[in-house]
């Protein structure tokens, strides 16, 4: 597509190289020039270079600035030289500024730093828990202190260098108690605004603590708004971007993006956790970030050059290639991150970046302007994560991820929806909307959901969904009681439970063996609790819906087999309490689960839980998904439309097992393990997949064709089957794109 004349450069297909110089002594940059960095980006196929204007020690990488000392080992004028060379090569340069870590400034103004309630300086770096007497290397400066004016000057200086964009990297101000700021500036401002002191201890029962928690987000968004305005006033066509790091920092920054999206041109989804997360993590984070940022904005996501945190040596070329492709298939722009030490010591895997960037350029036509195929959507509520999950966000997030991954494994088109987008115009795009323990739902969202289902939409809800309203305050009733045909009577709190079938012929139980379904999981910590908190709990409901399955009780608190005290107990008998219900509301259908179905699939991964999720989607959906892929679950599929085209990405994750070992926690009288419980490997080899079949509902198959752009646009074998076009992919090695379009 050609929107060259109207769109900002950052809304067009981009390939990004981030080159980080994070070295106390700077030995890795001796002799390194800005022009060399621009040429490196160009040679690898990138059209954007991201570099520091100022590092975490406070040193600047350009000459003549006033916001910090020049880096002592800088050759030439790195940022300006990169900009000049980039102009010649067609490489845009984005400057990283306003890093909240600044050691030089801290040494001059220690009282500008963030400090926690104990008076400890809040750190960006990782320090062993019991290390004493540590001097901060990357102290975090406070966004309420005079640092807020200092970073504005940083932005002004960077723009004067001629850069094409401003990137706020590691712009951190957390609400979490250990990392939340209690400096004099924060205390003073908060008291002026609210009339009382900051609560010193976390107490979610206290409205003052909840207000303080939410206030910290407003501080960050206020700074984003000020800096965005500054950038757009001085250089309207410059990019303004924020690093959200969506799977890190307890996921809190997703709320910053959701609530501050009006002040962001783009978001960088840093994915440094990718090597100890499942294959597909980067794809998941891109889709999550796109939901938070809103339609039509740009998400760039990173694949590190290195494995885990071993920054001085590269990962496997396969791992680098597949990680970059994970971004592409999710509709993001690929971003490769390399550190100066690994560039100095080992460049052997750089060609992996070049290969994927060349692929990306080859398929630009099919990426530009493509939009996701809307079918199923999983709602992500940042307010629920914060106010329900609190200091255990995984108790909510695992439920979300379980539904998402189950549908990904079944090749069902699935997106995320941000809480603020629970409005009619967004909901009606989808055949199915999933509320995975979405506890906190304000009235306007409830009204939109009711309207959506009444109009024929399909709704899946679990556990405590809609039991809290405005401000996430308990209502002791479902806000969606009428829609779900369920009344909330309480919570059954047991360490283990079961679900048994009441109507085995119901579509929600299709393909499910008529055996008890275990609810609950053991604790992998096992220091204070035997089981994962709340996992076996059920809402107690009075239901006018069809009761498809019921809650059953265990015979004891824990099991006596194998590992006595850790194993689950045997089944005792059914209670008659509903566990799964099905109903209609207006023209739509609903399925409700009194327990946390998604959390079970995320933690345990048994096929019964996945089949229950798939059945629910098929049951409540208005229509079948318009595309079906027959391939192993290790093949990641993503679907986009582009005018009359349907574009399908196939990414093969059929690797060696990445996570080799995991601990199961300690017990009384512990003994050493047999080997380390923390072994994480990169993918080394991909197993090709044969005979993948794709079915697309097109109406008249004779009018459509399928081609493979990465195979020189070769035509794929197709046949008609009623209204379905059936496409055969003989062999999937690492990555393929399939384009279905009208003939002629």
How should each PLM-predicted stretch be described?
Residues 2-30:
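Boundary/entry segment of secreted carbohydrate-active catalytic domains
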Residues 27, 95, 99-161, 186-217, ...:
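Active-site-adjacent "subsite" loops/lids of carbohydrate-active enzymes
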Residues 32-58, 161-163, 324-326, 406-412:
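Catalytic domains of carbohydrate-active enzymes, especially glycoside hydrolases
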Residues 37, 42-78, 101-123, 128, ...:
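Aromatic-lined carbohydrate-binding/catalytic grooves of carbohydrate-active enzymes
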Residues 19-21, 53-55, 93-99, 170, ...:
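A cross-domain feature marking catalytic cores of carbohydrate-active enzymes
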Residues 25-43, 145-157, 250-259, 316-324, ...:
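Short, acidic/polar
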Residues 2-5, 11-13, 209-210, 214-254, ...:
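Carbohydrate-binding surfaces of carbohydrate-active enzymes
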Residues 25-44, 65-90, 148-150, 219-223, ...:
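Aromatic- and glycine-enriched glycan-recognition loops and surfaces
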